[in-house]
């Protein structure tokens, strides 16, 4: 069993989570999420631009145990939010927040099941996370790193107001080949 969270981190989480939108609930993962989580992360079209190729239930369970022990907004940690459809309780995907620079910056990432892509759920979830980070937690800068071939994520980030800051050429050896990535960023002063 994971050790209890420090009081300050537990209180911070209680004040901020879950996040709700008109259609979504963004919350900590639960054990009942793991079969759906493992299933969509194991799909080739989902894993294509991610660091994994296969995502087993064993890996999903290890992920869950690691996430249970994390405090919300713990510096230098990736905190994953489950994205639940309020209407039916289905797990649509997840949004990751990499808290950096003692709460001044964060890197964002997202993974969604193909069944819930192209319906505005990722945009809605990202807007909720951006509002949390900029408006409630007063972050200065948000970033996202994306494979240059991931046109869906690029379109989403640009639609949310992120601007491309860098093109890293062959900066990552990824699934047997050198790959390019874009760095996107958004400052609080640019946030709408």
Annotate each predicted stretch with a short phrase.
Residues 41, 50, 71-73:
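Hydrophobic residues in alpha-helical segments
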Residues 71-76, 162:
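Short loop/turn motifs at secondary-structure junctions and domain boundaries
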Residues 45-68, 81:
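Conserved GNAT-fold acetyl-CoA-binding loop/helix
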């Amino acid at each position: 069993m994971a050790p209890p969270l420090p009081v300050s981190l537990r209180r911070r989480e209680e004040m901020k989570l879950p996040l709700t939108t008109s259609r979504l609930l963004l919350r900590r993962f639960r054990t009942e999420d793991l079969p759906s989580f493992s299933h969509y992360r194991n799909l080739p079209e989902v894993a294509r631009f991610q660091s994994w190729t296969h995502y087993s239930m064993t890996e999903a369970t290890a992920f869950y145990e690691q996430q249970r022990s994390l405090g919300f907004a713990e510096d230098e940690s990736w905190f994953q939010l489950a994205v639940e459809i309020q209407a039916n309780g289905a797990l649509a995907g997840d949004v990751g927040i990499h808290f950096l620079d003692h709460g001044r910056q964060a890197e964002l990432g997202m993974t969604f099941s193909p069944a819930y892509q192209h319906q505005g759920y990722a945009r809605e979830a990202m807007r909720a996370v951006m509002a949390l980070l900029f408006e409630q937690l007063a972050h200065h800068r948000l970033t996202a790193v994306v494979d240059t071939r991931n046109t869906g994520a690029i379109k989403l980030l640009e639609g949310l107001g992120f601007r491309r800051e860098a093109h890293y050429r062959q900066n990552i050896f990824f699934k047997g080949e050198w790959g390019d990535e874009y760095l996107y960023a958004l400052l609080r002063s640019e946030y709408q």
